[in-house]
Amino acid sequence: MEENWDTEIETEKPTYVPNFSTLETENTDNYSAYSNNDINNQNYDSERSFGNRGGYRSERSRPSNFNRGSRTERGRGRGFGTNRNDNYSSERDVFGDDERDQRRGFPGRGGYNGNEDGQKPNAFRGRGGFRNENEQRRGFGERGGFRSENGQRNFDNRGDFGNSGEEEDRPRSYGRGGFNNSDTGGRGRRGGRGGGSQYGGYKGRNEEVGVESGKSQEEGNEKDEKPKKVTYIPPPPPDGEDNIFRQYQSGINFDKYDEILVDVTGKDVPPAILTFEEANLCETLRRNVARAGYVKLTPVQKHSIPIIMAGRDLMACAQTGSGKTAAFLLPILSYMMNEGITASQYLQLQEPEAIIIAPTRELINQIYLDARKFSYGTCVRPVVVYGGIQPVHAMRDVEKGCNILCATPGRLLDIVSKEKIGLSKLRYLVLDEADRMLDMGFAPEIEKLMTKPGMPTKEKRQTLMFSATYPEEIRRLASNYLKSEHLFVVVGLVGGACSDVAQTVLEMRENGKMEKLLEILKSSEKERTMIFVNTKKKADFIAGYLCQEKFSSTSIHGDREQYQRESALWDFRTGKCTVIVCTAVAARGLDIENVQHVINYDVPKEVDEYVHRIGRTGRCGNTGKATSFFNVQDDHVIARPLVKILTDAHQEVPAWLEEIAFGGHGALNSFYAADSMGEQAGGNAVTTPSFAQEEEASWD
């Protein structure tokens, strides 16, 4: 169901900043932050656990002064937990529960039980059911369960990892949205990812660590249920020239860009330019370029800027971190400033001259900030629109005037269909990360956009596509949206990895990855590191585990709330967290300064994804390194294209990887046998739980 842009929604701002940062002092609570409203609106006694793995375990009680002690301890099973109450009274039993609460459980295992006065505590160890006065078991949730007072079944704002149980009419939880994942222990008929109607996450709405977003299958199955209202309003973008024009320092290899070969395919190619002066930018734009620290053109800029200024359609392929965003923003802004185009304020229907589309919220916001930087002090007004923020807030920003609309695909279609944005004046259509925009992930949205009323035909608009990778089938598909005489610029090799990144591939068994990861991080604790995994649950598990091991960590993926995603990136950019664990949502386009190391904890399934991941380091002439944990059993499909990427980038190719890539089935069988023997002899190595592969949801 689409969001209602026309209804005012009362703003509900988050009261804390979520992160996984490590303990600074012994008495610091790092996993939760309370406001006065939190204290007044919650039940103080709650337990949470992560089923079989021990996981996080948080226990809270309410001492008279509301102060909470902080203590970290190991939970049972494989995992970790926090105990937030050190003040057990004499009335409490061995599990730390008093007679009033009637909750019983095993730490790290879940399993709570409510019973009448005088009964002994009981718990269904490991299965976390609850018991009422009739001794009936309900809710065999493997992840915690819930309690009953006086025989009443409810979730009572607890946010427990409970299941919906065996009864169809079991009430849903509200306020703290607990886990209810069919993959992680759901036994009820109404399984799904998150029984709560609000935020969900590791611990619930006003707490910090999150594994799921609380997206319930109930919400999708019940047609009459209203979608959750989005109330988040992002903070305003940085103000003041010092913040707007913060410079990204180029590295020692920046001048080597001139050595990269450039190939331009097409007829009547405009000549390349060598300096910004040759671009004939207006004075204000030239001054903003200088303030931003741009001194020398990169190869993709030298060729793309004159092509766009000549009015030609363009498909450009250049390595990660080589200045593609400026390559299309500068000629677009130059045209608008030369034509004297200004924003028309407070019109119900805004008709931008340029629309820029990117696959992720973080990337499109980054492009918007660049457009805002280059257009500073002019009458050109860029606006950004993406999912996860309050619709009314976004619409008010659009109504103030919009010349350049930066948007994610789904939100763009929504705002166009509601006739808030018109397309009749569109001159430039830009697809950043074009291969991702045209694959099966976003192809239907792009096709819908092209057929919207008012969309100029490809003959009457200028279409620009940029990416670091272009599979052959995507290049064929792109021709449907480009003029027949479009140009194709290739800087270096199509789909090639950045040559400034030192790549290492390690053969690893699954149960040895965590130990190796800790070894790498301990040997370079001050390095800013991005760790990539293939599932959202694993991202949060690893981030939490690293936090327990005293590494300042956070995570970002499609199931986290938007303010959590923005906060995680901010913590990583500013150095508050030196490690961020990511899924594919952070693999493309993000330009984070001083990322020194990228670790592929899970090797991606496609080699193009590998190129984008390792491209988070080694940007703008800086050097970086990438380490990949290659599990032969899971990753052999990517072996041959990975060897080509390493060879083309002049990196060392391990002999075992070449054998897998070109040795046929016999080589694979021998590796499988060795891997199987290694698994049996693995001992007590720290093992990451196996999580089912899931699609990265909510990119938009």
Curated annotation (Swiss-Prot):
Organism lineage string: Eukaryota, Metazoa, Chordata, Craniata, Vertebrata
Catalytic reaction(s) noted: ATP + H2O = ADP + phosphate + H(+)
Motif Q motif positions after renumbering to this chain: 274-302
Task of the protein: Probable ATP-dependent RNA helicase required during spermatogenesis. Required to repress transposable elements and preventing their mobilization, which is essential for the germline integrity. Acts via the piRNA metabolic process, which mediates the repression of transposable elements during meiosis by forming complexes composed of piRNAs and Piwi proteins and governs the methylation and subsequent repression of transposons. Involved in the secondary piRNAs metabolic process, the production of piRNAs in fetal male germ cells through a ping-pong amplification cycle.
Pfam families: DEAD, Helicase_C
Family: Belongs to the DEAD box helicase family. DDX4/VASA subfamily.
Origin superkingdom: Eukaryota
GO terms assigned for molecular function: ATP binding; ATP hydrolysis activity; mRNA binding; RNA helicase activity
Composition bias type Polar residues, residue spans: 18-44
Domain Helicase C-terminal: 513-661
The protein, known as: Probable ATP-dependent RNA helicase DDX4
